[in-house]
């Protein structure tokens, strides 16, 4: 997905009379809709997976323009890793919410997770596969 990976935003709250409602902020909603659309295109006419799944997320983050040429080179060759925000767990939350009901029915189906966050051209790669069930004794 050609997006700059971002984390799941905090839930927002609005008061309407005596009621307080919770909603997702517009930037997070738009980001998740972009991922959801890409997931729908990738799935085609296939139904969502119903059993346990493995989720692989590869988030390539842009190098900040404020970095020197030396530091930018270090980021791109992998000697400096992306340890800034967004946190990798928040990236995963957005991905799982966007894929829910399209790729898999519910995010509780994810039983194996592998995520990587690096510097490079910004994009997000998502792979979901059915888990191979193993019998251990």
Model-derived regions, located:
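Acidic, proline/glycine-enriched N-terminal capping motif
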Residues: 1-137
């Amino acid at each position: 997905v050609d997006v700059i990976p971002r984390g799941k935003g905090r839930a927002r709250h609005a008061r309407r009379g005596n009621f307080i409602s919770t909603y997702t902020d517009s930037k997070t909603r738009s980001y998740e809709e972009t991922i959801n659309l890409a997931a729908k295109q990738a799935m085609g006419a296939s139904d969502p997976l119903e059993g346990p799944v493995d989720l692989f997320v590869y988030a390539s983050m842009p190098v900040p323009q404020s970095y020197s040429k030396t530091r930018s080179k270090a980021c791109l060759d992998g000697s400096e890793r992306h340890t800034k925000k967004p946190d990798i767990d928040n990236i995963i939350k957005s991905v799982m919410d966007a894929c829910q009901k399209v790729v898999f029915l519910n995010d509780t189906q994810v039983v194996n997770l592998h995520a990587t966050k690096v510097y490079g051209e910004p994009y997000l790669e998502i792979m979901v596969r059915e888990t191979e069930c193993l019998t251990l004794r």
